[in-house]
């Protein structure tokens, strides 16, 4: 789909504090003026509740191009940096106020890569999981019904971020955390396992030790298998759709 739209949220910082006031306004004005560098309709910018959004026609180079574009707008040596998160644009932003439960028929995934997001998957209604999204940094989310679509864009963003130092490793870890949470709800065998959180933290420590993108996904894949308490072939035979999606992606 040549017109697939990705949504990037960007936060600017100075000396590890969120950029505000006149300095932020000047930077945003520079960015707006330079958007003409892009082909018409390829990238547009929105601001809402202090957060900056870029809606872009996505292809395999979009993340890198946008990162380079933003780097050029920042004056070297002035201490300004940015972090970027990515999602897929479906129809429009769905505002999700903090601590409000969001339930949607057919909702599979609802997250931005790189966001410091907490997934509370403990609530169930009939056979449908109700996702409760709670996190200080999560103000908006996109509804995604196809894991392969979000993984494709996630993969592109993360490779760009890791290889060019655009994303802090902590953000990469948080991206994995969301997927592990979802997997724990869908394929875990013992829902009353009191040691589950401890086990999860052990997984995160292993991921934290990975220095490179390839080693990260090698460990991540192994953790996914261990988490299900079954072997690959058993899981493939069970035809669990979530596992098959992730299995296909990490392979």
Enumerate the language-model features and the residues they cover:
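Cytosolic nucleotide-utilizing catalytic cores of signal-transduction proteins
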Residues: 3-4, 11-23, 32-251
């Amino acid at each position: 789909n040549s017109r697939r739209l990705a949504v990037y949220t960007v936060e600017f910082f100075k000396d590890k504090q969120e950029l505000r006031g006149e300095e932020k306004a000047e930077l945003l004005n520079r960015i707006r003026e330079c958007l003409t560098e892009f082909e018409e309709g390829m990238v547009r910018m929105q601001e809402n509740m202090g957060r900056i959004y870029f809606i872009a026609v996505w292809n395999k180079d979009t993340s890198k191009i946008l990162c380079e574009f933003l780097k050029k707008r920042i004056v070297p040596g002035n201490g300004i940096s940015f972090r970027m998160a990515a999602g897929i644009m479906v129809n429009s932003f769905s505002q999700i106020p903090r601590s409000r439960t969001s339930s949607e028929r057919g909702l599979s995934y609802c997250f931005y890569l790189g966001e410091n997001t907490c997934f509370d998957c403990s609530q169930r209604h009939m056979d449908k999981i109700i996702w409760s999204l709670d996190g200080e940094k999560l103000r908006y989310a996109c509804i995604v019904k196809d894991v392969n679509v979000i993984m494709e864009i996630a993969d592109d963003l993360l490779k760009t971020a890791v290889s060019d130092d655009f994303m802090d490793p902590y953000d990469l870890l948080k991206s994995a955390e969301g997927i592990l949470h979802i997997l724990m709800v869908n394929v875990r065998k013992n829902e009353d396992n009191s040691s589950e959180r401890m086990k999860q933290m052990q997984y995160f420590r292993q991921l934290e030790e990975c220095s490179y993108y390839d080693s990260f996904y090698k460990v991540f894949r192994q953790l996914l298998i261990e988490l299900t308490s079954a072997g690959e072939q058993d899981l493939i035979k069970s035809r669990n759709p979530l596992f098959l999606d992730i299995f296909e992606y990490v392979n």
